Protein backbone atom coordinates (compact mmCIF):
# COMPACT_ATOMS: atom_id res chain seq x y z
CA UNK A 1 0.00 0.00 0.00
CA UNK A 2 1.51 3.33 -1.09
CA UNK A 3 2.08 6.02 1.47
CA UNK A 4 0.21 9.33 1.48
CA UNK A 5 2.71 12.03 2.33
CA UNK A 6 2.01 15.76 2.30
CA UNK A 7 3.33 17.65 -0.77
CA UNK A 8 3.87 21.40 -0.68
CA UNK A 9 5.14 23.97 -3.19
CA UNK A 10 6.82 27.17 -2.04
CA UNK A 11 5.35 29.07 -5.01
CA UNK A 12 1.75 28.44 -3.96
CA UNK A 13 -0.18 31.34 -2.42
CA UNK A 14 -0.91 29.54 0.81
CA UNK A 15 2.54 28.07 1.37
CA UNK A 16 3.34 30.14 4.47
CA UNK A 17 0.21 29.00 6.27
CA UNK A 18 0.72 25.42 5.11
CA UNK A 19 4.28 25.40 6.46
CA UNK A 20 3.19 26.81 9.82
CA UNK A 21 0.51 24.15 10.08
CA UNK A 22 3.07 21.47 9.25
CA UNK A 23 5.46 22.66 11.95
CA UNK A 24 2.82 23.29 14.63
CA UNK A 25 3.35 21.07 17.62
CA UNK A 26 2.44 21.60 21.23
CA UNK A 27 3.33 18.99 23.78
CA UNK A 28 0.10 18.00 25.43
CA UNK A 29 0.05 17.88 29.20
CA UNK A 30 -1.91 14.94 30.52
CA UNK A 31 -3.64 16.05 33.72
CA UNK A 32 -3.48 12.53 35.16
CA UNK A 33 0.26 12.32 34.52
CA UNK A 34 0.88 15.76 36.01
CA UNK A 35 -1.10 14.91 39.14
CA UNK A 36 0.66 11.58 39.55
CA UNK A 37 4.11 13.13 39.11
CA UNK A 38 3.37 15.91 41.59
CA UNK A 39 2.32 13.32 44.17
CA UNK A 40 5.38 11.14 43.58
CA UNK A 41 7.79 14.06 43.86
CA UNK A 42 6.18 15.30 47.07
CA UNK A 43 6.36 11.80 48.50
CA UNK A 44 10.03 11.40 47.57
CA UNK A 45 10.84 14.79 49.04
CA UNK A 46 9.08 13.84 52.27
CA UNK A 47 9.97 10.17 52.71
CA UNK A 48 13.18 9.80 50.71
CA UNK A 49 14.46 6.26 50.22
CA UNK A 50 11.25 4.65 51.46
CA UNK A 51 9.16 6.38 48.78
CA UNK A 52 11.68 5.68 46.01
CA UNK A 53 11.81 2.01 47.00
CA UNK A 54 8.02 1.70 47.16
CA UNK A 55 7.47 3.21 43.69
CA UNK A 56 10.37 1.30 42.15
CA UNK A 57 9.11 -2.06 43.42
CA UNK A 58 5.59 -1.23 42.27
CA UNK A 59 6.30 0.13 38.80
CA UNK A 60 9.24 -2.12 37.87
CA UNK A 61 7.78 -5.25 39.48
CA UNK A 62 10.71 -5.77 41.83
CA UNK A 63 11.05 -6.86 45.44
CA UNK A 64 14.16 -4.93 46.48
CA UNK A 65 14.75 -4.57 50.21
CA UNK A 66 16.52 -1.20 50.05
CA UNK A 67 17.74 1.48 47.65
CA UNK A 68 21.29 0.46 48.52
CA UNK A 69 20.50 -2.95 47.04
CA UNK A 70 19.60 -1.20 43.78
CA UNK A 71 23.02 0.42 43.38
CA UNK A 72 25.36 -1.37 40.98
CA UNK A 73 29.06 -1.57 41.86
CA UNK A 74 31.70 -0.64 39.29
CA UNK A 75 32.65 -4.29 38.83
CA UNK A 76 29.10 -4.95 37.60
CA UNK A 77 29.69 -2.38 34.87
CA UNK A 78 33.00 -4.03 33.98
CA UNK A 79 31.28 -7.41 33.83
CA UNK A 80 28.70 -5.94 31.45
CA UNK A 81 31.45 -4.58 29.20
CA UNK A 82 33.31 -7.89 29.24
CA UNK A 83 30.13 -9.78 28.34
CA UNK A 84 29.59 -7.91 25.07
CA UNK A 85 30.22 -9.56 21.73
CA UNK A 86 33.59 -8.41 20.32
CA UNK A 87 32.03 -6.33 17.52
CA UNK A 88 29.56 -4.65 19.88
CA UNK A 89 32.31 -3.82 22.37
CA UNK A 90 34.60 -2.48 19.65
CA UNK A 91 31.82 -0.28 18.27
CA UNK A 92 30.93 1.08 21.71
CA UNK A 93 34.57 1.78 22.55
CA UNK A 94 35.17 3.47 19.19
CA UNK A 95 32.09 5.66 19.63
CA UNK A 96 33.17 6.61 23.16
CA UNK A 97 36.65 7.53 21.96
CA UNK A 98 35.30 9.74 19.16
CA UNK A 99 32.76 11.47 21.41
CA UNK A 100 35.49 12.10 23.99
CA UNK A 101 37.93 13.47 21.41
CA UNK A 102 35.32 15.89 20.06
CA UNK A 103 34.38 17.20 23.48
CA UNK A 104 38.02 17.55 24.53
CA UNK A 105 38.45 19.79 21.47
CA UNK A 106 35.25 21.63 22.36
CA UNK A 107 36.58 22.31 25.84
CA UNK A 108 39.63 24.02 24.36
CA UNK A 109 37.73 26.06 21.77
CA UNK A 110 34.60 27.15 23.65
CA UNK A 111 35.86 29.48 26.35
CA UNK A 112 35.78 27.00 29.19
CA UNK A 113 38.82 28.51 30.93
CA UNK A 114 39.11 31.23 33.56
CA UNK A 115 40.54 34.62 32.62
CA UNK A 116 41.30 38.02 34.13
CA UNK A 117 42.94 41.36 33.36
CA UNK A 118 44.33 44.23 35.41
CA UNK A 119 43.33 47.85 34.87
CA UNK A 120 45.79 50.75 35.13
CA UNK A 121 44.84 51.51 38.75
CA UNK A 122 45.41 47.92 39.85
CA UNK A 123 41.79 46.78 39.80
CA UNK A 124 41.50 43.16 38.65
CA UNK A 125 38.46 41.95 36.70
CA UNK A 126 37.81 38.53 35.26
CA UNK A 127 35.82 35.36 35.18
CA UNK A 128 36.30 32.09 37.04
CA UNK A 129 35.07 28.94 35.32
CA UNK A 130 34.25 25.89 37.45
CA UNK A 131 32.59 22.55 36.67
CA UNK A 132 29.43 21.43 38.42
CA UNK A 133 29.96 19.33 41.53
CA UNK A 134 27.51 16.54 40.74
CA UNK A 135 25.33 15.68 37.74
CA UNK A 136 22.47 13.20 37.44
CA UNK A 137 22.01 11.23 34.24
CA UNK A 138 18.61 9.71 33.50
CA UNK A 139 18.69 6.74 31.12
CA UNK A 140 15.50 5.04 29.87
CA UNK A 141 15.22 1.32 30.61
CA UNK A 142 13.29 -1.58 29.20
CA UNK A 143 12.93 -1.77 25.43
CA UNK A 144 14.00 1.87 24.94
CA UNK A 145 17.63 1.29 25.93
CA UNK A 146 20.04 3.77 24.36
CA UNK A 147 23.73 3.26 25.20
CA UNK A 148 24.58 6.06 22.77
CA UNK A 149 22.67 8.51 24.99
CA UNK A 150 24.75 7.41 27.98
CA UNK A 151 27.93 8.32 26.10
CA UNK A 152 26.52 11.62 24.82
CA UNK A 153 25.47 12.77 28.29
CA UNK A 154 28.23 11.35 30.48
CA UNK A 155 31.32 12.10 28.40
CA UNK A 156 30.94 15.90 28.10
CA UNK A 157 30.22 16.05 31.83
CA UNK A 158 33.37 14.07 32.54
CA UNK A 159 35.44 16.17 30.12
CA UNK A 160 34.11 19.33 31.78
CA UNK A 161 35.48 18.09 35.09
CA UNK A 162 32.22 17.32 36.92
CA UNK A 163 33.09 15.88 40.31
CA UNK A 164 30.59 13.02 40.32
CA UNK A 165 28.19 11.57 37.75
CA UNK A 166 25.22 9.63 39.12
CA UNK A 167 23.19 7.56 36.66
CA UNK A 168 19.68 6.21 37.19
CA UNK A 169 18.23 3.56 34.89
CA UNK A 170 15.09 1.50 35.53
CA UNK A 171 15.29 -2.28 35.19
CA UNK A 172 11.70 -3.53 34.73
CA UNK A 173 11.40 -7.09 36.02
CA UNK A 174 15.05 -6.88 37.00
CA UNK A 175 16.28 -7.00 33.41
CA UNK A 176 19.52 -5.06 32.90
CA UNK A 177 20.91 -3.93 29.56
CA UNK A 178 24.60 -4.77 29.25
CA UNK A 179 25.19 -2.21 26.50
CA UNK A 180 23.85 0.58 28.72
CA UNK A 181 25.92 -0.52 31.70
CA UNK A 182 29.03 -0.89 29.55
CA UNK A 183 28.45 2.60 28.16
CA UNK A 184 28.23 3.91 31.73
CA UNK A 185 31.68 2.48 32.44
CA UNK A 186 33.17 3.88 29.23
CA UNK A 187 31.50 7.24 29.84
CA UNK A 188 33.00 7.62 33.29
CA UNK A 189 29.82 7.30 35.37
CA UNK A 190 30.64 7.06 39.09
CA UNK A 191 27.45 5.59 40.57
CA UNK A 192 24.54 3.70 39.00
CA UNK A 193 21.15 3.16 40.63
CA UNK A 194 18.61 0.86 38.97
CA UNK A 195 15.66 3.17 39.59
CA UNK A 196 13.60 5.17 37.12
CA UNK A 197 10.53 7.28 36.54
CA UNK A 198 9.51 10.42 38.39
CA UNK A 199 10.75 8.88 41.65
CA UNK A 200 14.31 8.70 40.28
CA UNK A 201 14.15 12.32 39.13
CA UNK A 202 12.91 13.31 42.58
CA UNK A 203 15.69 11.36 44.29
CA UNK A 204 18.32 13.12 42.17
CA UNK A 205 16.77 16.55 42.72
CA UNK A 206 16.10 16.36 46.45
CA UNK A 207 18.55 13.70 47.56
CA UNK A 208 17.79 10.79 49.88
CA UNK A 209 19.80 8.95 52.50
CA UNK A 210 21.24 6.80 49.69
CA UNK A 211 20.94 8.80 46.47
CA UNK A 212 22.94 12.05 46.55
CA UNK A 213 21.31 15.30 45.44
CA UNK A 214 22.74 16.57 42.16
CA UNK A 215 23.11 20.03 40.66
CA UNK A 216 21.76 19.22 37.20
CA UNK A 217 19.74 16.41 35.61
CA UNK A 218 20.25 15.38 31.98
CA UNK A 219 18.92 12.66 29.77
CA UNK A 220 15.73 11.60 27.94
CA UNK A 221 12.67 9.89 29.35
CA UNK A 222 8.95 9.31 28.96
CA UNK A 223 6.13 11.74 29.75
CA UNK A 224 6.46 11.10 33.50
CA UNK A 225 10.18 11.84 33.44
CA UNK A 226 9.69 14.97 31.32
CA UNK A 227 7.01 16.23 33.71
CA UNK A 228 9.23 15.53 36.71
CA UNK A 229 12.16 17.37 35.14
CA UNK A 230 9.96 20.39 34.49
CA UNK A 231 8.78 20.39 38.10
CA UNK A 232 12.22 20.11 39.73
CA UNK A 233 13.78 22.77 37.50
CA UNK A 234 14.92 25.56 39.77
CA UNK A 235 15.85 23.16 42.52
CA UNK A 236 18.29 21.71 39.99
CA UNK A 237 19.25 22.57 36.44
CA UNK A 238 18.03 20.44 33.55
CA UNK A 239 19.33 19.98 30.03
CA UNK A 240 16.09 20.47 28.08
CA UNK A 241 12.60 19.11 27.59
CA UNK A 242 12.94 17.53 24.17
CA UNK A 243 10.09 17.27 21.71
CA UNK A 244 9.70 14.69 18.94
CA UNK A 245 12.75 14.03 16.78
CA UNK A 246 13.12 15.96 13.52
CA UNK A 247 15.09 15.77 10.29
CA UNK A 248 15.11 18.29 7.46
CA UNK A 249 16.88 17.25 4.26
CA UNK A 250 17.96 19.87 1.73
CA UNK A 251 18.77 18.11 -1.53
CA UNK A 252 19.69 19.46 -4.96
CA UNK A 253 18.48 16.28 -6.67
CA UNK A 254 21.89 14.67 -7.16
CA UNK A 255 21.75 12.13 -4.31
CA UNK A 256 20.47 8.57 -4.65
CA UNK A 257 16.72 8.77 -3.85
CA UNK A 258 17.00 5.59 -1.77
CA UNK A 259 19.56 7.28 0.47
CA UNK A 260 17.27 10.25 1.01
CA UNK A 261 14.24 8.05 1.67
CA UNK A 262 16.14 6.06 4.30
CA UNK A 263 17.37 9.28 5.92
CA UNK A 264 13.74 10.37 6.27
CA UNK A 265 12.93 6.96 7.74
CA UNK A 266 15.76 7.30 10.28
CA UNK A 267 13.82 9.89 12.24
CA UNK A 268 10.33 8.72 11.38
CA UNK A 269 11.03 5.35 13.03
CA UNK A 270 11.50 7.02 16.44
CA UNK A 271 7.79 7.61 16.98
CA UNK A 272 4.59 8.68 15.26
CA UNK A 273 5.14 12.34 16.15
CA UNK A 274 8.66 12.52 14.67
CA UNK A 275 8.97 14.86 11.70
CA UNK A 276 10.80 14.21 8.42
CA UNK A 277 10.81 16.88 5.70
CA UNK A 278 12.55 17.07 2.32
CA UNK A 279 13.18 20.35 0.47
CA UNK A 280 14.27 20.13 -3.17
CA UNK A 281 14.02 22.37 -6.27
CA UNK A 282 13.70 19.32 -8.57
CA UNK A 283 10.10 18.12 -8.80
CA UNK A 284 11.06 14.94 -10.66
CA UNK A 285 13.50 14.06 -7.88
CA UNK A 286 10.78 14.48 -5.27
CA UNK A 287 8.70 11.95 -7.22
CA UNK A 288 11.65 9.51 -7.25
CA UNK A 289 12.04 9.87 -3.49
CA UNK A 290 8.32 9.22 -3.01
CA UNK A 291 8.66 6.07 -5.12
CA UNK A 292 11.69 5.00 -3.07
CA UNK A 293 9.68 5.49 0.12
CA UNK A 294 6.96 3.17 -1.18
CA UNK A 295 9.50 0.55 -2.27
CA UNK A 296 11.61 0.59 0.90
CA UNK A 297 8.91 0.92 3.55
CA UNK A 298 7.68 -2.72 3.48
CA UNK A 299 11.18 -3.93 4.41
CA UNK A 300 11.33 -1.85 7.59
CA UNK A 301 10.58 -3.59 10.93
CA UNK A 302 9.03 -0.35 12.24
CA UNK A 303 7.09 0.39 9.07
CA UNK A 304 3.85 1.15 10.92
CA UNK A 305 5.56 3.84 13.01
CA UNK A 306 7.34 5.25 9.94
CA UNK A 307 4.11 5.37 7.95
CA UNK A 308 2.22 7.13 10.74
CA UNK A 309 5.03 9.66 11.16
CA UNK A 310 5.41 10.45 7.46
CA UNK A 311 1.68 10.65 6.81
CA UNK A 312 0.99 12.69 9.94
CA UNK A 313 3.91 15.12 10.07
CA UNK A 314 6.15 14.48 7.05
CA UNK A 315 6.35 16.50 3.83
CA UNK A 316 7.99 16.68 0.42
CA UNK A 317 8.40 20.36 -0.44
CA UNK A 318 9.32 21.77 -3.84
CA UNK A 319 11.27 25.01 -3.60
CA UNK A 320 12.43 27.52 -6.19
CA UNK A 321 16.12 26.87 -5.63
CA UNK A 322 18.63 25.83 -2.97
CA UNK A 323 18.94 29.41 -1.71
CA UNK A 324 15.24 29.42 -0.89
CA UNK A 325 15.62 26.00 0.70
CA UNK A 326 18.22 27.50 3.05
CA UNK A 327 15.91 30.38 3.95
CA UNK A 328 13.08 27.96 4.75
CA UNK A 329 15.49 25.79 6.75
CA UNK A 330 16.42 28.77 8.92
CA UNK A 331 12.74 29.36 9.60
CA UNK A 332 12.18 25.70 10.50
CA UNK A 333 15.33 25.60 12.71
CA UNK A 334 15.41 21.79 12.68
CA UNK A 335 17.02 19.43 15.15
CA UNK A 336 18.90 17.62 12.35
CA UNK A 337 19.65 19.30 9.01
CA UNK A 338 21.15 17.35 6.13
CA UNK A 339 22.50 19.25 3.13
CA UNK A 340 22.77 16.53 0.52
CA UNK A 341 24.15 18.44 -2.43
CA UNK A 342 27.16 18.84 -4.72
CA UNK A 343 28.33 21.97 -2.88
CA UNK A 344 27.24 21.44 0.74
CA UNK A 345 29.74 23.90 2.19
CA UNK A 346 28.34 26.72 0.05
CA UNK A 347 24.80 26.12 1.27
CA UNK A 348 25.93 25.36 4.81
CA UNK A 349 27.28 28.89 5.11
CA UNK A 350 23.73 30.19 4.71
CA UNK A 351 22.38 28.14 7.63
CA UNK A 352 22.00 29.98 10.93
CA UNK A 353 19.52 27.86 12.86
CA UNK A 354 19.93 24.09 13.24
CA UNK A 355 20.84 21.73 16.04
CA UNK A 356 23.30 19.79 13.91
CA UNK A 357 24.26 20.30 10.27
CA UNK A 358 25.23 17.25 8.21
CA UNK A 359 27.15 18.28 5.10
CA UNK A 360 27.40 16.19 1.94
CA UNK A 361 25.71 13.11 0.56
CA UNK A 362 27.88 10.69 2.55
CA UNK A 363 26.96 12.26 5.90
CA UNK A 364 23.91 10.42 7.11
CA UNK A 365 22.27 11.74 10.25
CA UNK A 366 22.65 8.33 11.87
CA UNK A 367 26.44 8.71 11.91
CA UNK A 368 25.99 11.75 14.12
CA UNK A 369 23.58 9.87 16.34
CA UNK A 370 26.14 7.24 17.20
CA UNK A 371 29.76 7.84 16.50
CA UNK A 372 30.84 10.92 14.53
CA UNK A 373 31.71 12.74 17.76
CA UNK A 374 29.45 15.80 18.12
CA UNK A 375 26.64 15.46 20.64
CA UNK A 376 23.32 13.99 19.58
CA UNK A 377 21.35 15.73 22.34
CA UNK A 378 19.94 18.55 20.22
CA UNK A 379 17.29 21.29 20.45
CA UNK A 380 13.91 20.39 18.94
CA UNK A 381 10.65 22.19 18.12
CA UNK A 382 12.38 25.24 16.57
CA UNK A 383 14.37 25.91 19.76
CA UNK A 384 17.57 25.75 17.69
CA UNK A 385 16.81 29.44 17.06
CA UNK A 386 18.12 30.17 20.55
CA UNK A 387 19.68 27.04 22.01
CA UNK A 388 22.51 24.62 21.32
CA UNK A 389 23.47 20.95 21.42
CA UNK A 390 24.45 19.51 24.79
CA UNK A 391 28.13 20.11 25.36
CA UNK A 392 30.96 20.67 27.81
CA UNK A 393 29.63 24.20 28.38
CA UNK A 394 26.43 22.74 29.90
CA UNK A 395 28.44 21.29 32.76
CA UNK A 396 30.41 24.38 33.73
CA UNK A 397 29.41 27.69 35.26
CA UNK A 398 31.03 31.10 35.36
CA UNK A 399 31.63 33.42 38.31
CA UNK A 400 32.60 37.07 37.88
CA UNK A 401 35.87 38.13 39.56
CA UNK A 402 36.23 41.67 40.93
CA UNK A 403 39.20 42.85 43.02
CA UNK A 404 39.16 46.63 43.36
CA UNK A 405 42.33 48.47 44.33
CA UNK A 406 42.39 51.38 46.79
CA UNK A 407 42.74 53.78 43.88
CA UNK A 408 39.98 52.04 41.94
CA UNK A 409 37.64 52.37 44.92
CA UNK A 410 37.79 56.16 44.51
CA UNK A 411 36.83 56.18 40.84
CA UNK A 412 34.26 53.39 40.99
CA UNK A 413 32.86 54.59 44.33
CA UNK A 414 31.99 57.95 42.85
CA UNK A 415 30.14 56.34 39.94
CA UNK A 416 28.39 53.72 42.06
CA UNK A 417 27.23 56.11 44.79
CA UNK A 418 25.77 58.53 42.25
CA UNK A 419 23.79 55.75 40.59
CA UNK A 420 22.73 54.27 43.94
CA UNK A 421 21.35 57.60 45.19
CA UNK A 422 19.47 57.87 41.89
CA UNK A 423 17.83 54.52 42.62
CA UNK A 424 17.04 55.47 46.20
CA UNK A 425 19.38 52.88 47.70
CA UNK A 426 21.32 54.82 50.31
CA UNK A 427 23.06 51.80 51.86
CA UNK A 428 24.49 50.90 48.48
CA UNK A 429 25.80 54.44 48.11
CA UNK A 430 27.25 54.60 51.63
CA UNK A 431 28.90 51.18 51.21
CA UNK A 432 30.84 52.61 48.27
CA UNK A 433 31.50 56.00 49.91
CA UNK A 434 32.94 54.51 53.12
CA UNK A 435 35.82 53.21 51.01
CA UNK A 436 36.52 56.57 49.40
CA UNK A 437 39.07 59.06 50.68
CA UNK A 438 37.42 62.41 51.35
Swiss-Prot record:
Q: Which cofactor does it need?
A: Zn(2+)
Q: Which residues form the active site?
A: 335 (proton acceptor), 336 (proton acceptor)
Keyword annotations? Amino-acid biosynthesis, Histidine biosynthesis, Metal-binding, NAD, Oxidoreductase, Zinc
- Describe cofactor binding as the record notes it: Binds 1 zinc ion per subunit.
For the ligand (substrate), the binding residues are 245, 267, 270, 336, 369, 423, 428
* Gene Ontology biological process terms, A to Z: L-histidine biosynthetic process
Task: Identify the InterPro entries for this entry.
Answer: Ald_DH/histidinol_DH (IPR016161), Histidinol_DH_CS (IPR001692), Histidinol_DH_monofunct (IPR022695), Hstdl_DH (IPR012131)
The pathway that the record names for this protein is:
Amino-acid biosynthesis; L-histidine biosynthesis; L-histidine from 5-phospho-alpha-D-ribose 1-diphosphate: step 9/9
Q: Which reaction does it catalyse?
A: L-histidinol + 2 NAD(+) + H2O = L-histidine + 2 NADH + 3 H(+)
Functional summary from the UniProt entry: Catalyzes the sequential NAD-dependent oxidations of L-histidinol to L-histidinaldehyde and then to L-histidine.
Q: Which family does it belong to?
A: Belongs to the histidinol dehydrogenase family.
Mind telling me what this protein is named?
Histidinol dehydrogenase
Write down the species.
Burkholderia lata (strain ATCC 17760 / DSM 23089 / LMG 22485 / NCIMB 9086 / R18194 / 383)
Q: Which gene encodes it?
A: hisD
